[in-house]
A protein has these predicted regions:
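Active-site metal-binding motif and surrounding structural segment of the metallo-beta-lactamase
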Residues: 34-77
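Catalytic core of the metallo-beta-lactamase
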Residues: 1-49, 85-172
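Short, polar loop motifs at secondary-structure junctions
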Residues: 78-84
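Residue-level signal for the nucleotide or nucleotide-sugar donor/cofactor binding architecture
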Residues: 63, 145-146, 194
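Glycine-rich, phosphate-binding/catalytic loops in enzymes
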Residues: 43-45, 70-71, 143-144, 184-186, ...
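Flexible loop residues that form catalytic
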Residues: 57, 172-173
């Protein structure tokens, strides 16, 4: 299995998974801004894209999943009750799909959004905004369909994973090293909190510090309706 993070030098992470026996590939959380880069990489490496997977409906960027489905004929995979249109492969909690001989398993982890999932392959867990590495904590819960108490309660899903599993989150500062779940259990402040009240205080303070999401008014409608707007301010 080849596993690689593709978006160098930016905060939004995209992960490439390849079964080297069949040359089948999956992209997890591809970003529309880099669509051409993904296609170039797939073509230059002789890979067939089987799955474009979104860990949740994003508010900070436009997903490339529906364009990859349109252009390459792959499946667009999300949680079964997502409000995102364009999805043609819906998954349930603990469901597995196969990429060649590689099992890709989905673990429902709502809170940041109501459709959040952890995507697991052997050795790696792609957590979206459900869990970040170290002091970054977790994603904010004050965006559409986010719920603090639900997120807090969903942290119990982490008990399903081996401590040596590498946490590959949806956002990290460029150059951040992806660490193991066991390391995060000791060094991520959310995972050492004693109670929900502590978590609630952290979320409120984090939201105040972060402020608004500049791309939300463009990204959310695009991701719901699977349509690229005529004008994208940041492109």
């Amino acid at each position: 299995m080849l596993f690689e993070q593709l978006n160098d030098g930016v905060w939004a992470m995209t992960y490439l998974i390849v079964d080297e026996e069949t040359s089948e590939a999956a992209l997890v959380d591809p970003v529309y801004d880099y669509l051409d880069n993904y296609i170039d990489r797939l073509e230059s490496s002789g890979l067939t894209l089987k799955y474009a997977i979104a860990t949740h409906m994003h508010a900070d960027h436009i997903t490339a999943c529906f364009k990859l489905r349109e252009q390459l004929g792959c499946d667009y995979v999300m949680w079964k009750s997502t409000s995102s249109l364009g999805v043609n492969r819906y998954v349930e909690d603990e469901e597995k799909i196969m990429l060649g001989s590689i099992p890709i398993q989905f673990h429902y982890s709502p809170g940041h959004t109501s459709d959040s999932v952890i995507v697991h392959v052997p050795g790696y867990m792609m957590t979206g905004d459900f869990l970040f590495n170290g002091m970054a904590g977790v994603g904010r819960d004050d965006l559409p369909s986010g719920r603090m108490k639900v997120h807090w309660d969903s942290l119990s899903v982490l008990d399903r994973f081996l401590e040596e599993t590498i946490v590959c989150s949806g956002h990290e500062a460029p150059g951040t090293e992806m660490m193991s779940l066991g390391w995060n259990m000791k060094n991520n402040p959310i995972l050492t909190m004693p109670d929900f009240e502590s978590y609630e205080s952290w979320q409120i303070a984090s939201a105040e510090q972060l402020g608004g999401v500049s791309k939300i008014k463009v990204a959310v409608p695009a991701n719901i309706f699977a349509e690229i707007p005529e004008h994208i301010p940041w492109m």
